[in-house]
């Protein structure tokens, strides 16, 4: 009887282990392309510095997640769409891009890249932000 229970236990263990291995699959993600420019980053350099750190001799490339949010009560543009990283405003979609999304509630989190922020003996570069989206439709 003990041999039957032992064999039965081994069979169950084998089934569990083979199912576990079948569930594991390799997911190959294509790299994110940061092609979508935003505007207004110059006004938010202090916030970008808090996120990316102080300027260094070479440009920085910091991958982050950004929140893209409608801002219908914006005093300057009722269609404004704000970009936040770590809860800090870092810029906006351009007026033309925001106008294309007018009337839609936008609240998405997307990959983003903070780039620039160099300081050397000859020049200094501001931080910029690019979103990892291919089109505005990804925000709807």
Regions found by a protein language model. Give the residues of each.
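Conserved active-site motif detector
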Residues: 2-140
């Amino acid at each position: 009887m003990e041999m039957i229970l032992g064999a039965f236990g081994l069979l169950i263990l084998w089934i569990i282990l083979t199912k576990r291995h079948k569930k594991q699959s390799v997911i190959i993600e294509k790299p994110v392309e940061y092609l979508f420019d935003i505007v207004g980053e110059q006004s938010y350099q202090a916030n970008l510095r808090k996120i990316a750190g102080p300027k260094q001799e070479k440009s920085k490339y910091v991958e982050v997640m950004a929140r893209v949010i409608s801002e219908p009560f914006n005093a300057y543009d009722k269609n404004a769409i704000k970009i936040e990283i770590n809860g800090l405003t870092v810029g906006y979609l351009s007026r033309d891009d925001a106008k294309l999304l007018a009337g839609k509630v936008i609240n998405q989190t997307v990959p983003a890249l903070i780039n620039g922020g160099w300081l050397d003996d000859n020049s200094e570069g501001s931080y910029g932000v690019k979103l990892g989206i291919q089109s505005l439709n990804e925000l709807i």
